[in-house]
Amino acid sequence: MEVLRDLGKNVENEAYLHATEQDLMGENIFCTSLVGEELGRMKSWGKHPNSRAEHLLSSPSFMNDLPQTFMEPLLFKTACSRGTNARMSTQYLSHEEDSEGVTSTCLDKLTNKEIKIRSKYLVGADGGNSKVAENLGLPFEGKMGVGGSMNILFRADLSKYVAHRPSVLYWVLQPGADIGGIGMGLVRMIRPWNEWLIVWGYDINQPAPEVDEKFATKVARDLVGDQKLNIELLSVSTWTVNNMYAKKMSKGKVFCAGDATHRHPPSNGLGSNTSIQDGFNLAWKLAYVLKGCLLYTSPSPRD
């Protein structure tokens, strides 16, 4: 949130408007299902009095929960309002670097025509399957595909099961929860208390399951513990748990950041938080280089 504050107090304030505030983030709750036995709770998100005091003393910003579906439009709008020429439905294909800058070849997916974009630098923040990092030949260490997971995004009113014990994360221990994925079933609150994301694992040594409406509904009902639950299924997807990072972040005038360079589960605040910090670190350095105020810094991940 300090990074958003640096973009402008209005940006930080708008993020708070869309976010779930700290008090509603609650505690980590462990259970056999939302309806079933509660196994325990763990204070988190700065809820312990000592942690809250430490946070208040160390930062003017407040902890909150803001899903990417709300954060990304805010950042996109802010960039456009400040003169950025932003394009949607555009796919990076390749680039060529020269002494003056970088020429990127992209595909306009609306017209199916290739276009050239000229820039002084190129930043590849294109996710865990980064084409920019691949074309750069960045060296990576670690392993991809160490576990299999599925995401099930749905709407359902679960207030009668959770409003009295608010939380962002409800960890569900059921038979099969230790197979693949993140080691447990997860019911993740997106909007209190009617929009949810379920994370469930599958055996990475087997083909990814076909997560159709019937399968997704069964998983959701099992983890909630209500076999008559009416849900509005919004989306389903499968993904792999990775454990890999780039040993170099850049080459020449081309840089990579975010999931393009470190591919790991988003647990413990290692999701958008790390990517935002990557972007902020790179942005201020490039800005000062362009102003002639900063010389080259090492491309290692620690910088």
Each predicted region: which residue ranges?
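Core beta-strand elements of the Rossmann-like FAD/NAD(P) dinucleotide-binding domain
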Residues: 112-120
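Conserved FAD-binding catalytic core of PHBH/FMO-like flavoproteins
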Residues: 9, 77, 121-243
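Active-site-adjacent segment of FAD-dependent monooxygenases/related oxidoreductases
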Residues: 2-73
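Internal hydrophobic alpha-helix adjacent to the cofactor/substrate pocket in enzyme cavities
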Residues: 276-295
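FAD-binding beta-loop-beta segment adjacent to the flavin cofactor pocket
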Residues: 240-256
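A conserved short coil-to-beta-strand element within the FAD-binding core of flavoproteins
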Residues: 88-102
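Helical element adjacent to the flavin cofactor pocket in flavoenzyme catalytic cores
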Residues: 66-87
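Conserved small/polar residues in nucleotide/adenosyl-binding loops
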Residues: 296-303
